[in-house]
Each structure stands twice: as C-alpha cells, then as structure tokens.
C-alpha cells in the first residue's frame, strides 16, 4: 500500500461505532450502503451493535471556531450535509465498488478535477 495523506482538519468521536463509521465514510466520499460491514450492522437485529438504522438517525455536532479560542457554541446538522471537497481514493481492491455517486464528487455544483480526486 502507498496511502496518501489527505488532511481534513476534523476530529471524529461517537458513542455509536456505526454512526462514527457513517460520518467517516461520508467525509471520504464513499457510499456506506456499498460497504457490507456498515450496511449489515445497520440491518442486523440478531447482534445489534448500533441503534442506527439509516443515515437519518445520525446527527453531526460541530464545535464552532471562536477566533481560535475554545468555544461552547455547537452547530447541529444532518449526516447528509456532511461532505468533503476532496474525496479519498479507495484501495485498489475496492476501486469502483464503494465510491459515492458522481453527484457526491461535486463541491458547490462544480465537478472536482481528476487530479484532486486521486
């Protein structure tokens, strides 16, 4: 493997492992429905590891930057609002299997060039 760093400037934390995975996958530009371990964890009633059954069950809390000072202000939004301007490139074994739709690789309605997405 020859991974490339792609700094996003975020810290992820959750009490629910699937909620955390959904947020991370969304930030990476992948489609959680195409990743079996996430999809199956949300559907399992036999060994439930999560209360998350869909992306609608996840809320994102973002600490507001207060001019570089610690702030107690928090912004809440739905998982669907989360995204990244620079999607990750999956491992070759997953290439063309887990990426989000072409529409998800747009930022402000503008398609990202190939060199940015690699």
What residue spans do the PLM features occupy?
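Acidic/aromatic/glycine-rich contiguous surface patches that form carbohydrate-binding/processing clefts
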Residues: 1-118
């Amino acid at each position: 493997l020859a991974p490339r760093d792609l700094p996003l400037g975020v810290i992820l934390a959750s009490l629910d492992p699937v909620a955390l995975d959904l947020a991370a996958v969304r930030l990476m530009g992948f489609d959680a429905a195409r990743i079996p371990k996430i999809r199956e964890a949300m559907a399992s009633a036999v060994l439930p590891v999560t209360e998350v059954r869909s992306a609608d069950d996840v809320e994102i809390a973002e600490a507001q930057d207060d001019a570089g000072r610690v702030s107690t202000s928090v912004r809440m939004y739905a998982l669907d609002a989360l995204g990244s301007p620079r999607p990750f490139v999956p491992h070759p074994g997953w290439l063309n299997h887990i990426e989000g739709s072409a529409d998800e690789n747009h930022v402000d309605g503008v398609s990202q060039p190939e060199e940015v997405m690699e």
